[in-house]
């Protein structure tokens, strides 16, 4: 089972396409949708929804996959549920990058402060990161510097921020899920 968490652009048709691509790894791909506008409510909703969905699966190794803002949540929700996660162009600091896009971006900083201390250290090797060198939204080099002590990083030379084509990485994602 793969949980797919969309980015800030929840209605993008690219989300459906990425889910179809992930079905080459596991036919059971589930979209876990969230508002993107209310971080505290989103966290509660995502925790409840993932716990509920896990009750209906016998997969011994479910995987969280998120893009952009979805990767922010995949890392945290995956950690809190003991799941591996794949972070594609993760938005590590939405309290900064979401300024002007949502009403209360500071809620992300509050969530980070209340999260388990040093959670990445405790989550080492339980996530893999795929970064675009040509990300048109985030500073992928800064993201790599923040995450490389904890997670393996794969670099892509072509894909933009929303990362529409996962095909090249499907074998690595599958190996990570099963490994």
From Swiss-Prot:
Q: Which InterPro entries match?
A: AB_hydrolase_fold (IPR029058), UPF0227 (IPR022987), UPF0227/Esterase_YqiA (IPR008886)
* Domain of life from the UniProt record: Bacteria
- NCBIfam families, A to Z: PRK04940.1 (NF003431)
The family classification in the record reads: Belongs to the UPF0227 family.
| Protein name in the entry | UPF0227 protein Shewmr7_1806
């Amino acid at each position: 089972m793969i949980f797919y968490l969309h980015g800030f652009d929840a209605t993008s048709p690219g989300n459906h396409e990425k889910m179809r691509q992930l079905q080459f790894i596991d036919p059971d791909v589930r979209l876990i949708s969230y508002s993107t506008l209310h971080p505290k409510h989103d966290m509660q909703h995502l925790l409840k929804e993932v716990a509920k969905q896990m009750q209906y699966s016998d997969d011994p190794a479910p995987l969280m996959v998120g893009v952009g803002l979805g990767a922010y949540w995949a890392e945290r929700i995956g950690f809190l549920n003991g799941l591996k996660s794949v972070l594609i162009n993760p938005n590590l600091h939405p309290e900064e990058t979401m300024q002007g896009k949502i009403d209360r971006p500071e809620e992300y900083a509050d969530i980070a402060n209340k999260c388990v201390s040093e959670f990445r250290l405790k989550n080492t090797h339980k996530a893999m990161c795929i970064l675009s060198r040509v990300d048109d939204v985030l500073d992928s080099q800064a993201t790599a510097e923040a995450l490389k002590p904890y997670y393996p990083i794969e670099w892509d030379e072509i894909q933009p921020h929303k990362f529409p084509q996962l095909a090249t990485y499907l074998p690595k994602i599958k190996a990570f899920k099963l490994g």
